[in-house]
């Protein structure tokens, strides 16, 4: 049997995504074992994922990582399920020279530490909104300008700064940019200032509740750019439930969706993954479950390519892996970040999120420019 440790947020503030990640790992474990296990030297070995709860607390994540390595003797790790916990768990894995494939870290600040043993299957934060810009620039009429509002937390600022840099490199004129305190209830002043600059595209980089307030207040103020785009919100049931018809034509991003049609070199496609997952757990997978399954598959393939569970050999196999999965391409740069993977662009159309970019995975065409509040 091959034992692999996993650090997940099963309780606390990040429990919802952590529980989905747990199911994603268990699906992968069961799928691998059903096909005969992990193949080493011609023989199949059952996979057992040894899960520890970090309670959504970074300090606990470090302690759980230490426990999995020193007490449970796990020499290969999965997780953690978010950036904050990974930031504390990764140095522990690095100290013990234990490979860690995380399903939840995408902050460039983490990967810029150039850890030797950390690998992440998510596309980095810096690329989160690049697809929205690429999509918009492919439309007619082609946008010329944008404005951006961003929450003051470090992750939102990271995404916003990267988005501005990418937009400028693509020739867009950034006519307005401002930061607001995370959790603020009134964005009308900033929205008015942004609208006054006359942007074709208006980006909001924050959290789901702030995205909802942006739509509500933009509608009240009759602010109508050609596109409203968000780092978080569109694509979730809560967003469309809160906004109803007003949610239509808003654009957001996701690391994965059940309708994603990726070319696969290993494992099943998104459609069959979603069906099998729903049969096993009684509900559809989300991007957090899918990322966990992808992380687990990546580690399995690395073990088989190394033909060993020795930490150093598996680490070396991870560093050169190139895998086309239902989740997207998995290929790590010299930081351990998965820069090969696209972030998918979704748009709410007729009350439901649909994939609109990249073209090779899209299930619908972008609705651009936004037809206006009266036509929602």
Task: Name what the model sees in each region.
Residues 83-94, 192, 199-221, 295-298:
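Hydrophobic alpha-helical
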Residues 215-293, 309, 353, 359-375:
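Extracellular/periplasmic periplasmic-binding protein-like sensory domains
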Residues 276-289, 298-357:
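Segments of small-molecule ligand-sensing domains
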Residues 61, 120-145, 185-188, 211, ...:
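Hydrophobic alpha-helical segments within soluble ligand-binding/sensing domains
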Residues 23, 71-177, 226-252:
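Extracytoplasmic ligand/sensor domains, especially the bilobed periplasmic-binding protein
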Residues 1-28, 52-58, 81-82, 149-157, ...:
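Extracytoplasmic "Venus flytrap"
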Residues 3, 16-23, 38-112, 121, ...:
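Beta-alpha junction/loop-to-helix N-cap segments that form part of ligand/metal-binding clefts
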Residues 17-40, 161-168:
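Short, polar/charged alpha-helical segment
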């Amino acid at each position: 049997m091959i034992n692999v440790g996993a650090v997940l947020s099963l309780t606390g503030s990040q429990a919802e995504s952590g529980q989905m990640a747990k199911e994603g790992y268990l699906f992968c474990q069961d799928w691998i074992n059903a096909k005969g296990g992990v193949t080493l030297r011609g023989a199949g070995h059952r996979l057992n994922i040894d899960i520890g709860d970090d309670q959504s607390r970074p300090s606990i994540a470090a302690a759980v990582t230490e426990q999995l390595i020193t007490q449970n003797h796990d020499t290969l790790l999965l997780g953690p399920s978010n950036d904050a916990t990974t930031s504390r768990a990764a140095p522990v894995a690095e100290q013990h020279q234990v490979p860690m494939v995380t399903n939840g870290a995408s902050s460039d600040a983490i990967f810029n530490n150039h850890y030797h043993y950390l690998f992440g299957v998510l596309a980095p934060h810096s690329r989160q909104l690049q697809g929205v810009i690429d999509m918009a620039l492919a439309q007619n009429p082609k946008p010329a300008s944008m404005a951006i509002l961003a929450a003051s937390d470090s992750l939102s600022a990271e995404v916003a700064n990267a988005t501005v840099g990418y937009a400028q490199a693509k020739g867009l004129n950034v006519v307005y940019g401002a930061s607001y305190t995370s959790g603020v209830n009134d964005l009308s002043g900033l929205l008015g200032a942004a609208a006054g600059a006359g942007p074709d595209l208006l980006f909001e980089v924050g959290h789901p509740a702030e995205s909802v307030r942006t739509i509500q207040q933009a509608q009240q103020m009759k602010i109508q750019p050609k596109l409203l785009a968000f780092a978080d919100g569109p694509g979730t049931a809560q967003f469309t439930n809160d906004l109803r018809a007003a949610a239509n034509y808003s654009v957001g991003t996701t690391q994965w969706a059940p309708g994603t049609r990726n070319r696969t070199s290993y494992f099943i496609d998104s459609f069959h993954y979603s069906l099998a997952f729903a049969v096993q757990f009684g509900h559809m997978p989300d991007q957090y479950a899918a990322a966990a399954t992808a992380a687990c598959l990546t580690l399995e393939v690395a073990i088989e390519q190394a033909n060993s569970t020795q930490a150093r050999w598996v680490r070396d196999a991870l560093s050169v892996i190139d895998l086309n999965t239902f989740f997207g391409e998995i290929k790590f740069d010299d930081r351990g970040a998965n820069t090969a993977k696209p972030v998918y662009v979704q748009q709410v159309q007729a009350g439901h999120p649909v994939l609109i970019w990249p073209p090779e995975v899209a299930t619908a065409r972008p609705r651009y420019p936004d037809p206006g509040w009266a036509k929602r």
